[in-house]
């Protein structure tokens, strides 16, 4: 049976001291691509989606794209914008089920009104949808946080190594390589905090 993977992007870098709030228009002005409409050129947090296209095609896998949304760094995301984008992605994931894995492009330093850890919230919902036996992985910026919610929901993640972040394509390729090795049973990644 052909393996099936869902991918999506939801990212920004929040500065909690900034008075400039991010609403839905902030994402639409920077990057908002509906499923299957992301350009071929990868962006900082969307490289897993674009690199995954060739990865899946080469292996004969089905690559189901969800929304890709990025807002330029600013202050808090308003609650309505975060929840609407989160729910859009979750609805797309539900429609794509069953899947063998979820591959995400995240930043890791988002904060929204009412959510200190939006990525942890998103990942928790994703894990609830896919269950414990589906691989969930993501790329992160090195400025990201690693909360307990993220540790519990992720099978593994890869963070950018370079500053400036010129290695986002290579890190997406690393993520997909680890996914390959996990699917083959060669590795069993785990995430921990010490």
Located regions from the model:
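Conserved beta-strand segments of alpha/beta enzyme cores
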Residues: 62-64, 156
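Active-site histidine-anchored catalytic micro-motif
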Residues: 6, 10-13, 79-86, 94-187
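Flexible, glycine/charged-enriched surface loops at secondary-structure junctions
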Residues: 186-194
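N-terminal amphipathic/basic leader segments beginning at the initiator methionine
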Residues: 1-58
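Glycine/alanine-rich phosphate-binding loops at beta-alpha junctions
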Residues: 56-61, 77
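Charged, often glycine-rich, active-site loop that binds/positions anionic groups
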Residues: 65-86
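Well-ordered alpha-helical segments embedded in enzymatic catalytic cores
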Residues: 51, 84-89
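Short, glycine/charge-rich beta-strand/loop segments that flank catalytic centers
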Residues: 68-73, 104-106, 144, 193-194
């Amino acid at each position: 049976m052909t393996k099936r993977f869902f991918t999506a992007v939801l990212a920004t870098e929040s500065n909690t001291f900034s008075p400039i709030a991010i609403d839905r228009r902030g994402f639409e002005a920077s990057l908002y691509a509906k499923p299957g409409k992301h350009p071929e050129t990868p962006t900082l947090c969307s490289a897993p989606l674009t690199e995954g296209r060739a990865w899946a095609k080469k292996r004969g896998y089905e690559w189901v794209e969800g929304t890709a949304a990025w807002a330029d760094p600013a202050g808090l995301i308003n609650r309505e914008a975060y929840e609407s984008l989160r729910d859009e992605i979750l609805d797309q994931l539900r429609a794509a089920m069953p899947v063998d894995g979820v591959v995400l492009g995240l930043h890791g330093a988002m904060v929204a009104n009412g959510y200190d850890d939006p990525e942890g919230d998103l990942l928790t919902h994703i894990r609830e949808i896919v269950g414990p036996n589906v691989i969930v992985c993501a790329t992160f910026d090195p400025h990201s946080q690693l909360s307990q919610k993220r540790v519990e929901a992720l099978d593994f993640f890869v963070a950018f190594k370079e500053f400036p972040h010129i290695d986002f394509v290579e890190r997406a390729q690393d993520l997909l390589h680890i996914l390959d090795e996990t699917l083959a049973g060669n590795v069993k990644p785990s995430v921990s905090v010490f």
